[in-house]
């Protein structure tokens, strides 16, 4: 297969919702990974069929026969591997991370490279292909535009310079208020630990420094310990999901027996 066709198909598949790509850590760097069967699903999508009708030289039409389709899909994916666009990988569980000298992450699973690519439906593959998107180009042009705007600051009209002055004052004022609130909440917490240590202390804006949205950082207004924090709530939701999966598997085993 021509390399331009391989890159075209990879670019098409790369950010498709059917691929259900997830974030993982490969060599401590965020990397997208997916299952082989999701790649096959992308090729079966209506969007790919439209592409193949318009540009059959870049997007080869896929046969209706399942065996021939599977063979062609495997051939395309083998080209992905040969061109190092993807590599076979393995998702590690927490206990497996320790065996490989990796520290388990709360947010992303750790990934390692596999030595074989069997193209099984549930086999994981890691993306090594990261084409530039329109957003990337817009960010570059935006940064250049901002730099040029500041370089030309002396040429700005007086009204614009006055506006940026007041805007900068407002920004510094916001930062001052933010750090003021952070200091006050720390003082209140330290004092509360003298009286309600068993509750984990009293926090104003318990989610202020949590990894959540801007407005969510100020919800709720107060809380005790870490039970109101975004991280704790997220952790409890994950535990409930795991427990539900375990119970489901247990019921299936009981039915099988």
From Swiss-Prot:
Pfam families: Sec62
Sorted UniProt keywords: Endoplasmic reticulum, Membrane, Protein transport, Translocation, Transmembrane, Transmembrane helix, Transport
Cytoplasmic topology ranges: 1-137, 192-257
Principal location class: endoplasmic reticulum
GO molecular function: protein transmembrane transporter activity
GO biological process: post-translational protein targeting to membrane, translocation
Listed InterPro entries: Sec62, Sec62_asco
Entry's transmembrane regions: 138-158, 171-191
Residues in the Lumenal compartment per record: 159-170
Compartment(s): Endoplasmic reticulum membrane
Domain of life: Eukaryota
CC terms in the record's Gene Ontology section: Sec62/Sec63 complex; translocon complex
Family: Belongs to the SEC62 family.
Function comment: Required for preprotein translocation.
Protein name: Translocation protein SEC62
């Amino acid at each position: 297969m021509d390399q331009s066709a391989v890159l075209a198909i990879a670019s098409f598949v790369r950010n498709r919702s059917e691929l259900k790509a997830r974030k993982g850590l490969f060599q401590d760097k965020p990397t997208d990974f997916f299952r082989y069967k999701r790649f096959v699903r992308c090729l079966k999508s209506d969007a790919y069929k439209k592409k193949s009708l318009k540009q059959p030289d870049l997007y080869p039409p896929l046969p209706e026969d399942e065996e021939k389709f599977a063979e062609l899909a495997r051939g395309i994916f083998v080209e992905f591997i040969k061109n190092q666009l993807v590599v076979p990988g393995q998702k590690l569980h927490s206990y497996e991370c320790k065996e490989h000298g990796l520290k388990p992450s709360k947010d992303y699973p750790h990934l390692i490279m596999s030595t074989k690519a069997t193209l099984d439906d549930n086999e994981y593959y890691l993306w090594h292909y990261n084409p530039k998107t329109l957003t990337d180009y817009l960010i570059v042009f935006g940064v250049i535009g901002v730099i040029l705007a500041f370089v030309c600051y002396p040429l700005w009209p007086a009204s614009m310079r006055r506006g940026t002055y007041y805007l900068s004052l407002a920004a510094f004022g916001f930062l001052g208020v933010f750090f003021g609130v952070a200091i006050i909440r720390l003082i209140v917490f330290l004092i509360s630990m003298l009286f309600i240590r068993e509750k984990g202390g009293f926090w104003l804006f318990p989610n202020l420094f949590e990894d959540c949205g801007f407005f969510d950082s100020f919800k709720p207004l107060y809380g005790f310990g870490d039970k109101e924090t975004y991280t704790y709530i997220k952790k409890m939701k994950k535990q409930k999901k795991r427990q539900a999966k375990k119970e489901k598997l247990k019921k299936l085993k009981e039915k099988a027996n």
